[in-house]
A protein has these predicted regions:
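Short beta-strand edge/turn micro-motifs at domain boundaries
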Residues: 125-182, 188-189, 224-274
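Long, acidic/polar, low-complexity amphipathic helices and coiled-coil-like
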Residues: 25-46, 106-158
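Short N-terminal edge-element motif at the start of the domain
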Residues: 55-140
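Long, ordered, amphipathic alpha-helical scaffolds
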Residues: 213, 220-222
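Residue-level detector of intrinsically disordered/flexible regions characterized by low predicted structural confidence
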Residues: 4, 218-220
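Bacterial Sec-dependent N-terminal signal peptides
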Residues: 1-31
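Core segments of small alpha/beta cavity-forming domains
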Residues: 20-91, 156-209
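Short, exposed beta-strand/loop patches in secreted or surface proteins that constitute
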Residues: 104-106, 216-218, 240-242
Length: 274
C-alpha cells in the first residue's frame, strides 16, 4: 500500500512540475510576443517592462537605453536571413548612440499601413492593396485611404509608346476640336491622346467603381506597416503567428537609406509606382 501511495505521489509531483513548466513557458511566450502595434512602439521606445506594464516619463526606467537595447534585439523576425546581423547591429547603434536617441511616434507621421484585401469585382475575387495613414480629425485622429493599387487596373492605364500618328493636330482648336471624334473611335487608343504628364490614379477608379457597386469588399488578407520615422532608415513591420518566442509584430525588412533620394525611390517602390 505504501509503495502504491509513493508511486502516486511521485507521479503527481512530476505532473505538477510539468504543468508549472508549461505554464511558465506560456507566460514567457506571452511576454515575449509583441501583440499590438502600440506595444511594438512602446517596446521600441523603452516605455514598458517585460510584463507589458507601461512606464511613464516620471519612471526611472522610462526610455532607458539598456532596456531599449534589450527590446530592439528581439523585435526582428529572426527567420529572415535577408536582414544581416551587421545591418541589425548598425541600426541598433544608430538608434541608441545618438545625442537624442530617436523614438517612434504614433502621431508623428512618416509611417503608414499597407492593407492587402480581397474585393469581388464583377463576380470575380480580385486582390486590391489599400495604403492607409492617420490624419487629424476634429479633436483626434482617424485612419484614411490615401492610395490604392490593383493589378486589374494596370491594363486600363497602359500607353502604347510604339504607335505613332495618333495625335490631335496643333491647329485643332481652329476647328473647334471637331477631330476629337477620332480620339474616341477606338477605346484602346484613347490613352494616346492623354498628356505625357498624366499619372494613373488607382484610388479614383477604385472610388468610382465602389460607388457604382461594381466592386464589393470581402476580406482583409494581410496587413503590414512601413516606417520612415528613424532618420536614415526604413523598416517594415509584419505580424507572425507561429510556435516559439519570436512572434507577433516584428521588423520583417530593414533598409539603410544612404543617398538623399533613397527614401523617395523606396516609397515609390512600396506604392507600386513606376
Amino acid at each position: 500500500m505504501k509503495r502504491v501511495l509513493f508511486t502516486l505521489l511521485v507521479g503527481l509531483s512530476f505532473h505538477v512540475q510539468a504543468q508549472l513548466v508549461d505554464e511558465m513557458k506560456d507566460e514567457s511566450r506571452l511576454y515575449a510576443e509583441t501583440k499590438q502595434i502600440n506595444q511594438f512602439i512602446r517596446r521600441f521606445n523603452g516605455e514598458e517592462d517585460e510584463k507589458g506594464e507601461r512606464y511613464y516619463a516620471t519612471d526611472k526606467q522610462y526610455r532607458n537605453l539598456k532596456l531599449r537595447k534589450k527590446y530592439l534585439e528581439i523585435l526582428f523576425d529572426r527567420s529572415n536571413t535577408g536582414i544581416s546581423n551587421d545591418l541589425k547591429t548598425q541600426f541598433v547603434k544608430d538608434v541608441l548612440e545618438k545625442k537624442e536617441p530617436p523614438i517612434l511616434d504614433f502621431h508623428g507621421g512618416n509611417w503608414f499601413a499597407e492593407v492587402q484585401a480581397t474585393f469581388n469585382a464583377n463576380g470575380k475575387d480580385q486582390p486590391i492593396t489599400l495604403f492607409m495613414e492617420l490624419e487629424k480629425h476634429h479633436l483626434g485622429t482617424r485612419w484614411t485611404i490615401y492610395k490604392v493599387h490593383a493589378d486589374m487596373y494596370n491594363d486600363s492605364f497602359k500607353r502604347d509608346t510604339v504607335v505613332v500618328g495618333k495625335f490631335l493636330h496643333p491647329m485643332s482648336h481652329e476647328l473647334d476640336f471637331m477631330n476629337l471624334r477620332k480620339a474616341f473611335l477606338n477605346k484602346d487608343s484613347v490613352t494616346q491622346y492623354v498628356s505625357k504628364k498624366f499619372t494613373p490614379d488607382h484610388l479614383s477608379v477604385f472610388l468610382y467603381e465602389s460607388k457604382k457597386g461594381s466592386i464589393k469588399y470581402k476580406s482583409v488578407e494581410q496587413v503590414k506597416f512601413h516606417f520612415f520615422q528613424i532618420p536614415g532608415w526604413y523598416f517594415e513591420l509584419a505580424e507572425f503567428n507561429r510556435p516559439g518566442y519570436n512572434n507577433g509584430w516584428l521588423i520583417s525588412n530593414l533598409v539603410k537609406l544612404s543617398a538623399p533620394g533613397d527614401e523617395a525611390i523606396l516609397r515609390r517602390y512600396v506604392h507600386h509606382e513606376n
